């Protein structure tokens, strides 16, 4: 049982005493329990050398804002200089927004310090920038997924009750005042809607406080994935105890004693039912993929585990339809802008031995990635580059720019998409996207000069098209001539780049 203690034992870096007792003192408790504060829209001056370069990162500013809300109606400021009083005209909601931004900055400090200290412990900092690339996951999928049988397409569910988020943070934060402040911010922004949802109320929260919202969402995902890893490692024990009680980690060691009694008798019986060494899990944003070499029954058991996990630990009902189990040979899943699949390719070889001939059939599986053209056309349509049918249209909002700026903007978008979709196994969809952007650029320029597209293209010549080629494509076109079949095949092979740290906006909107 020692390996389980290693998992659930709280690490020293997770138990943080933040700066709130020193910074905010008793004000947080008052704020968390007094929701009837009525503050006039007053402001104060703070020198730029104190407030910082953007007037948003100053802890002193946050403390003064809390003091101002707490001492309601005690200070009345007259506005004499609008340049000095930069906060004039803001109401109480502005104070709460500034406080939440300061909260997000302070709560990230221990994690940043831990990252720096981990680098200082090592003499040489590992070159991990390549692992940060989004494309770095696809070589892993190519190597592993071709040998697996089933895949589960999982949408990480929501909403999450706000009190559950506070309980999750209790594992990391020991400051009671900071938790009071967090509860107060939740109540202020959601006005009684105690869930993080995709509705308008949560949208305003994530839009006004993106830093705090990302921190809370990542905390929820870390908790969910840490329990998943625990279930994965201890899957052979789950048969011997109640699944729901195993999720609650408060009295875990006491429960493990009960598991140890039945463990010796049931271990050999349950190990083969649950142990799966060929299981892989990847996630990006709110979507995750779990693939296994096991049977369909095993994947259904994991689906049941996930549903019970969200219901028992996070206290909300998750629809089982959010987890789709499919066989790799009959399913294509959409992940990171690519439509991925593992098709079976059959090939027949005739062999002859003496007077007898034999027909040997072989089945090979290969991980393939393609550009899903229909969602991509929908994204281009929302950006006003084409209509819903995929026909290029002009972009009037850019017609007032200079010709070089228009060509540069279209060319940059085209090159970025080509760069991101360079790993596609089939390039036809990528060529169509390039065609839409090129013709949309030509229509925009023709609209600006009140000319026809044909006349404008004849005047620009071939230089217009060169702006839409990537530098890598220019080099490959010189080194690998398309007339040679082997080189042509190499030219069309997937290329993964290790310098892409974010998804293109057009791809991310799919």
UniProtKB/Swiss-Prot annotation:
One of its GO terms (cellular component) is chloroplast. GO terms for biological process: mRNA processing; RNA splicing; tRNA processing. Keywords: Chloroplast, mRNA processing, Plastid, RNA-binding, tRNA processing. The keyword Plastid applies. It is found in: Plastid, Chloroplast. GO terms for molecular function: RNA binding. InterPro entries: Domain_X, Maturase_MatK, Maturase_MatK_N. It holds the Pfam family Intron_maturas2. Belongs to the intron maturase 2 family. MatK subfamily. Usually encoded in the trnK tRNA gene intron. Probably assists in splicing its own and other chloroplast group II introns. This is Maturase K. The lineage of its organism: Eukaryota, Viridiplantae, Streptophyta, Embryophyta, Tracheophyta. The gene is matK.
